[in-house]
Amino acid sequence: MIRVDKLRGVIAQKNMSQSDVAKAIGITPKTFYTKMKNGVFGSDEIDAMISLLEIKNPADIFFARG
């Protein structure tokens, strides 16, 4: 389960919208919003977001427990 709040914060810090991120990682904005709501992304999508958003500590966002 991902920490959606932290991911939203990183997206905002990069002055991007969720729609921008969706397009950049190759999914539709609707699919991105659904995945955010459910807190589940595929490994390829996670890798793409880590690179795109220059996330330094991905475990804090994408591999959160509980």
Task: Please report, for each region that a protein language model flagged, where it lies by residue.
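Short, basic-rich loop-to-helix N-cap that marks the start of a DNA-contacting helix
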Residues: N38-S51
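Short C-terminal boundary/hinge segments that cap the last helix of small helical domains
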Residues: E54-G66
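Short alpha-helical DNA-recognition segment
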Residues: N15-T31
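Key DNA-contacting residues within the recognition helix of helix-turn-helix
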Residues: R8, Y33-T34, F62
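Recognition helix of helix-turn-helix/homeodomain-like DNA-binding domains
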Residues: I27-F41
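Alpha-helical residues within the helix-turn-helix
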Residues: A12, K23, S51
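Helix-turn-helix DNA-binding elements, focusing on the entry/boundary residues of the two helices
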Residues: Q18, I46, P58
